[in-house]
Amino acid sequence: MKHKSEFLNFIQERGYLCQCTNIEGLDQLLLQNNYVVAYIGFDCTASSLHVGSLIQIMMLRHLQKFGYKPIVLLGGSTTKIGDPSGKDKARSVLPIEDINQNISGIKKALKKMVYFNDGKAGAIIVNNADWLDSIKYIDFLRDIGAHFSVNRMLSFDSAKTRLDREQNLSFLEFNYMLLQAYDFAELNKKYGCRLQIGGSDQWGNIVNGIELGKKLNLPELFGLTTPLLLSAQGKKMGKTESGTVWLDGDMLKPYDYWQYFRNIDDQDIGRFLRFFTDLPIDEIKKLESLKNQEINEAKKALATEVTKICHGDKEAELAQSSAVSVFENGDSSLLPDYTITKKQVANGISLIDLLHDIGLEPSKGAAKRLIQGNGCKVNDYTINDINYIINSKSFKDQSFIKLSAGKKRHIKVMVS
């Protein structure tokens, strides 16, 4: 479907466009206004975002590219409740201190990928605690709650799925969709925001906000969803067997971030190049047409471009050159390192414990299975003894040992 606005044509061609509440109306708004404000919300449940949020971050960047103003809404208040969308059970309630620390970490990561200033397309960060924390309950029920039908709320997936499975849905979580709807109304009143963007699991929450806007006699609001980020195997993106793929370089080294995208399934190459890079479509088509061993060149291009956006050109080029040196030239000097103490070496440390402590495996059980499956190497020698101990003999005359989990995860273990 061809649209009148360049923005909608662009996001459709890249695969971002999933659902829209009124595509013709939004198309007209974007065409006639060179100043449109849109928002994307992020819960503050961790001290960084992970790659599961990357599509939304790219949407922020694309809004700016076309001259529109994005709002990053951080859920300083709604995180205290937790969004039930796509969840089987309620999240643990986070202390306010943790939420505030998480907000700082998320801001740090976002500022590397989106530009924030007072310009026409400069993004702004807003915390919904600014208005939700001061709400008076009775006033909220009267002025906002009266506009919501419980029957309709129960029909949305966030509630319906839990109830169909006879899983508990607390009154606290049930209120989340009212608060998110209220956020949209507040952002319209304060900033003239007309568009909310979110993952497809947010459809019900977005529709509630638009319907509330109508009942409050606000200008027409619009909602647009992007596809949920799934791998070729149908798994949600964001976590691997080794742990979460964080966007913060202090929580996941740029080298490991680069490796994550270098090792994606062949079937994901074209889709991920469209989603996560700024490469033009013509170049993407050339890369996704590569066959056999040449596919690896497309994966390297993807990994480098994605790492540039998240960590900058310098870190991306360093990650790529390190990978080439390690995997193609056999150079261990550029491997990520982990330090253990002389006392640990003297006492001996279990290989299973070390694999887990380093983060090469998420659990000791996984480390044991890796060894039993001949997937673990020490200094390029396969170890299949689950009782293997790393001690001074392991280092011999070297200052480090190379520890490998599978073909693509390697760490240099040093002694201090």
UniProtKB/Swiss-Prot annotation:
- Give a yes or no for keyword Translocase in this entry: no
Per the record, what are the reactions this protein catalyses? tRNA(Tyr) + L-tyrosine + ATP = L-tyrosyl-tRNA(Tyr) + AMP + diphosphate + H(+)
Keywords per UniProt: Aminoacyl-tRNA synthetase, ATP-binding, Cytoplasm, Ligase, Nucleotide-binding, Protein biosynthesis, RNA-binding
Q: Where is this motif: 'KMSKS' region?
A: 236-240
Offer one example of a GO biological process linked to this entry: tyrosyl-tRNA aminoacylation
Residues that bind ATP, according to the entry?
239
Q: Which GO terms describe its molecular function?
A: ATP binding; RNA binding; tyrosine-tRNA ligase activity
- Domain (S4 RNA-binding) spans 349-415
'HIGH' region (motif): residue ranges: 44-53
Which family, according to UniProt?
Answer: Belongs to the class-I aminoacyl-tRNA synthetase family. TyrS type 1 subfamily.
Describe its function: Catalyzes the attachment of tyrosine to tRNA(Tyr) in a two-step reaction: tyrosine is first activated by ATP to form Tyr-AMP and then transferred to the acceptor end of tRNA(Tyr).
Name by which UniProt lists this protein:
Tyrosine--tRNA ligase
